[in-house]
């Protein structure tokens, strides 16, 4: 006996039922589906179909709104930054690009530094937002905080400025147009 001669026990494997192959087979014509009606047709009904009754998704009102220009914020704790410093993943200056790569946050727009955990490194951290406790801990350790004003995408589209400089320059304020009726 070898592997090529192994077979299942007799009667263990049931034969496939071939339907719709002529009246002599016993499962021809209607193929075991009965006569007419919804169950004999191909395809399926949607699970929300409720017969003639008004379906639930039409009975309930629409609600909510998704803003098209919504910006997402990635939060980073000081304990995490301290761990990166101890591992040698970042140097004396931590930029927004460093945060993006180390947080694995390719789809985040802004970065916020939170003051959770111990922090004893004198480093310069660039981010969009800082919590009060984070600023206190960074300055107590002898470090500095630098606020970035633009997202990485916005900074890459600024003409005439290097990327790092464009990140740190504030956006120009939007001026309101004067109405024609206001004559002064």
Curated annotation (Swiss-Prot):
Listed GO CC annotations: cytosolic large ribosomal subunit
Region: Disordered, residue numbers: 1-62
Biased composition (Gly residues): 21-35
Keyword rRNA-binding: yes
RNA-binding is among the record's keywords: yes
Any one of the GO BP annotations: translation
Keywords, alphabetical: Ribonucleoprotein, Ribosomal protein, RNA-binding, rRNA-binding
Gene3D superfamilies in the record: 3.100.10.10
SUPFAM superfamilies: Ribosomal proteins L15p and L18e (SSF52080)
Pfam families: Ribosomal_L27A
GO molecular function, one term: rRNA binding
Superkingdom: Bacteria
Entries under InterPro entries matching the protein: Ribosomal_uL15 (IPR030878), Ribosomal_uL15/eL18 (IPR021131), Ribosomal_uL15/eL18_sf (IPR036227), Ribosomal_uL15_bac-type (IPR005749)
Quaternary assembly: Part of the 50S ribosomal subunit.
NCBIfam families membership: rplO_bact
Family: Belongs to the universal ribosomal protein uL15 family.
UniProt function note: Binds to the 23S rRNA.
This protein's name: Large ribosomal subunit protein uL15
Organism in which the protein naturally occurs: Chlorobaculum parvum (strain DSM 263 / NCIMB 8327)
């Amino acid at each position: 006996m070898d592997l090529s001669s192994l077979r299942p026990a007799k009667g263990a494997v049931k034969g496939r039922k071939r339907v719709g192959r002529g009246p002599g087979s016993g499962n021809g014509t209607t193929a075991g589906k009965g006569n007419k009606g919804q169950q004999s047709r191909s395809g399926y009904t949607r699970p929300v179909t409720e017969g003639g009754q008004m379906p639930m998704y039409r009975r309930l009102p629409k609600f909510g709104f998704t803003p098209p220009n919504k910006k997402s914020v990635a939060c980073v704790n000081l304990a995490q930054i301290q761990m990166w410093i101890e591992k040698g993943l970042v140097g004396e200056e931590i930029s927004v690009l460093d945060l993006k790569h180390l947080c694995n946050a390719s789809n985040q727009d802004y970065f916020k530094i939170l003051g959770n955990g111990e922090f004893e490194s004198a480093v310069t951290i660039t981010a969009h937002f800082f919590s009060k406790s984070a600023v206190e801990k960074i300055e107590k350790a002898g470090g500095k905080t630098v606020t970035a004003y633009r997202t990485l995408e916005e900074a890459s589209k600024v003409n005439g400025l290097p990327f790092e400089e464009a990140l740190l320059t504030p956006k120009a304020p939007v001026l309101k147009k004067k109405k024609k009726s206001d004559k002064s």
